[in-house]
Regions:
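Small-polar-interrupted transmembrane alpha-helices in polytopic inner-membrane proteins
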Residues: 48-52, 82-95
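Hydrophobic cores of alpha-helical transmembrane segments in multi-pass inner/ER membrane proteins
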Residues: 17-24, 113-122, 183-197
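Interfacial aromatic-anchored transmembrane helix boundaries in multi-pass membrane proteins
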Residues: 56-63, 89-119
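Hydrophobic alpha-helical transmembrane segments
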Residues: 16, 41-46, 69, 84-88, ...
């Protein structure tokens, strides 16, 4: 889930430390593959463009709006470090387009990056027993659960930090966000299952671990 919070809403105590941590992680993640090939850079850029397109399209769900994040597939295909770099850049571009303020770029990168970081370990543990499509769907579900929980925590903190915000607003937001969270988990998992099945048939080398424990070429993109 993505934070669409404009600048000036969150107190600096909420977004400034998150932005500092995100920048540190961005530098550290860049050193993981400092000597990446042009093909790896192009691969990460292509997945980043796909993620940006998915996150820019909003799907109305009653009083709220939802958009795909592709956090699960992104984390599985790129790994934690590369996925975090891509998510940071994507969120910065979305902020320029008005999808959330610049002050929440760090928070969004951390919220989505946490889910992406868990997606690949979950996938590699599951793919030895299940099909790539099922494994990618389950890894995506875990990523969405983690990102959604962090999203709700940030929103709850923002409401509590507002001096004029009534206490009942947190319950209202939770009652609206929880069904959307469940729908988002289901939708993202279905999309991830389709991506996993497609790649298993057409480009199995892009998956990090093939069935039987063989390493895939996607591990080189991390």
């Amino acid at each position: 889930m993505h934070l669409h919070i404009p600048d000036g809403v969150l107190p600096p105590l909420a977004w400034a430390p998150a932005l500092a941590v995100a920048l540190v992680l961005l530098v550290l993640s860049a050193r993981v593959r400092a000597g990446g090939t042009r093909l790896q850079v192009a691969y990460q850029s292509a997945l980043g463009a796909l993620t940006l397109a998915a996150m820019a399209v909003e799907i109305p769900l009653g009083p709220l709006e939802y958009h795909l994040t592709l956090v699960g597939p992104l984390g599985v295909l790129l790994g934690p470090a590369a996925a975090f770099r891509v998510l940071f850049v994507v969120n910065a571009i979305l902020a320029m387009l008005g999808h959330g303020g610049f002050t929440v770029v760090g928070l969004n990168a951390l919220v989505l990056g946490a889910g992406a970081a868990l997606a690949r370990p979950a996938y590699t543990a599951l793919v030895r027993r299940f099909s790539p499509g099922t494994s990618l769907a389950l890894g995506t579900a875990l990523a969405q659960v983690v990102s959604g929980a962090l999203w709700l925590g940030v929103v709850g903190y923002a409401l509590r930090a507002g001096a004029s915000a009534p206490a009942s607003r947190l319950g209202l937001v939770a009652s609206l966000a929880f069904p959307m969270w469940l729908i988002g988990i289901a939708v993202e998992s279905v999309v991830a299952a389709g991506i996993g099945r497609f790649l298993a048939r057409v480009r199995p080398d892009l998956l990090p671990v093939r069935r039987g424990g063989m390493a895939g070429a996607a591990e080189e993109a991390a």
